[in-house]
Amino acid sequence: MNCGRRMLLCALFFFTIAWAGPVEAQTEQGRVTRIAEIEIDPYQVEPYKAALREEIADSIRLEPGVLTLYAVSIKDHPEQVRIFEVYASQATYQTHLQSPQFKKYKAATQGMVRSLKLFEASPILLGAKK
């Protein structure tokens, strides 16, 4: 992905999370919000991104309880990936972890991931325009 497109995706991600007005605000009631901080082997960034794109597309399409999956990399550090995740409930999060597409992603990327940190998050306000 070229630098301009990566910058646009990062800008869209942070605009949506931090600056978008509450046109359709989500409440956190019952929802699970997580942030994943991932470091990828720099020599395997492109295969990792391909596997991640497939997993996100399939999860959003196939799992009604997967509400939001945003993946970005840190500018000038494509091996540093952050994923913002919102699930309808703890049960749908657990279902996602057992889904065929997530298991496929984990198996495919196992040797690519140098470190993984998961954080439970408490939304202040999640706003997005339709």
Protein language model regions, located:
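Acidic/polar helix N-cap motif
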Residues: D41-Q44, H77, S89
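An amphipathic, aromatic/His-enriched active-site/gating alpha helix that lines ligand/cofactor pockets
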Residues: T27, E54, D58-L67, V86-E120
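N-terminal targeting signals for Sec/Tat export/insertion, comprising classic cleavable signal peptides
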Residues: V32-L62
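Glycine-rich beta-strand-turn "strand-cap" elements at beta-sheet edges
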Residues: N2, L8, F15-V32, Y70-H77, ...
